[in-house]
UniProtKB/Swiss-Prot annotation:
Residues 300-319 have a biased composition (Basic residues). It is found in: Mitochondrion. The gene is MRPS9. Residues 296-319 are annotated as: Disordered. InterPro entries: Ribosomal_Su5_D2-typ_SF, Ribosomal_uS9, Ribosomal_uS9_bac/plastid, Ribosomal_uS9_CS, Ribsml_uS5_D2-typ_fold_subgr. It comes from Yarrowia lipolytica (strain CLIB 122 / E 150) (Yeast). GO terms for biological process: translation. This is Small ribosomal subunit protein uS9m. The keyword RNA-binding does not apply. One of its GO terms (cellular component) is mitochondrial small ribosomal subunit. Keywords: Mitochondrion, Ribonucleoprotein, Ribosomal protein, Transit peptide.
Length: 319
């Protein structure tokens, strides 16, 4: 037993005596190995091509002309790194908008007396991008908020670059479609327009009142106060005139058919607003902002089976 122990001890000492003095070899990093492999492939390709220039990865090279090792390293790189975000088209657009914002962030903003901006909708913005990437609501809101910051720059100081950018994303509203066909004054200086509301239809003639006289409003041959007994209906008819502060400056003759007093008043009001624009097209923006040029498309909701009216239900009892 003693002899075996001494022999084992001598073996261990001998192993220590003949051990190498060099440090143990550390495993290489994965990125280092890949870099060395790419360098070897490039050297092989250079030798194979007869000492010509290095492989140009920006040129479209067919695999048949490149060694197998070098062909595996050829990758089609995207035009911008934003492509890796999954929404590259939107991020690239935001990068352009934010760059313009940073460039002109020192310019003063003016919100007083400026109409609110009207930018493209999310569906239109998706069409403008022309890509298969979806555009969510928060992404569209991000764009409109950035554009609104540029929109409120003082018009006297607004650069042409900002104007072109806003014009690209502005929604084009056809205001003539809201007011029907473009009307003109006839030989007698009258504006003949039409208006509709619910089941009522009105034909309205608007003329300027002679100087020194107060214009009047007649409905089916009767004065406005005689035809509409309620103040609410009379106020609705005269609302377009009050918006442009032209009470008493025009004579209005309306012929209205169908519906009740509420529908008739709405139809006449729309016809008056359209007639005012024929006389003075510069008032279109003010009337449109007040909602006078948009037809009210609401109608009475139909009665439902089992209900007393459209939505009113009878009292429920358990038994």
């Amino acid at each position: 037993m003693l002899r075996l122990t001494r022999s084992v001890k001598n073996l261990s000492l001998g192993a220590v005596r003949f051990q190498s003095t060099q440090a143990p070899r550390q495993p290489k990093n994965m990125f280092v190995r890949e870099a060395e492999r790419a360098e070897r492939d490039a050297q092989e390709a250079q030798k194979w091509r007869g000492g010509k220039k290095h492989l140009n990865f920006g040129v479209d090279m067919s695999i048949s002309e490149t060694p197998r090792g070098a062909a595996e390293n050829v990758r089609v790189a995207p035009a911008t790194a934003l492509q890796y975000t999954g929404r590259g088209a939107h991020e690239q657009t935001m990068e352009v908008v934010n760059r313009v914002r940073r460039q002109y962030e020192f310019l003063p903003r003016n919100r007083e007396g400026v109409s609110p901006p009207n930018f493209v909708t999310r569906i239109t913005y998706l069409t403008m991008l022309g890509s298969s990437e979806p555009v969510s609501g928060p992404q569209h809101t991000e764009l409109t908020k950035a554009l609104a910051d540029l929109y409120y720059i003082d018009n006297q100081l607004k650069p042409q670059v900002v104007k072109d950018l806003l014009r690209r994303f502005s929604r084009k509203i056809d205001t003539d479609a809201e007011s029907g066909e473009i009307e003109t004054l006839d030989e007698q200086g009258r504006a003949v327009t039409r208006g509709r509301r619910k089941t009522s239809s009105a034909r309205v003639i608007v003329t300027k009142a002679p100087e020194g006289t107060v214009g009047e409003v007649r409905v089916n041959g009767l004065l406005l106060s005689q035809y509409f007994k309620e103040l609410q209906h009379r106020s609705e008819v005269l609302f377009p005139l009050s918006v442009v502060q032209s009470e008493g400056k025009y004579n209005v003759f309306a012929t209205v058919l169908g519906g009740g007093n509420s529908g008739k008043a709405g139809a006449i009001s729309l016809g008056i607003a359209r007639g005012i624009i024929v006389h003075n097209p510069l008032l279109r923006k003010r009337l449109s902002k007040a909602g006078c040029l948009t037809r009210d498309a609401r109608t009475k909701e139909r009665k439902k089976p089992g209900l007393r009216r459209a939505r009113a239900a009878p009292t429920w009892v358990k038994r």
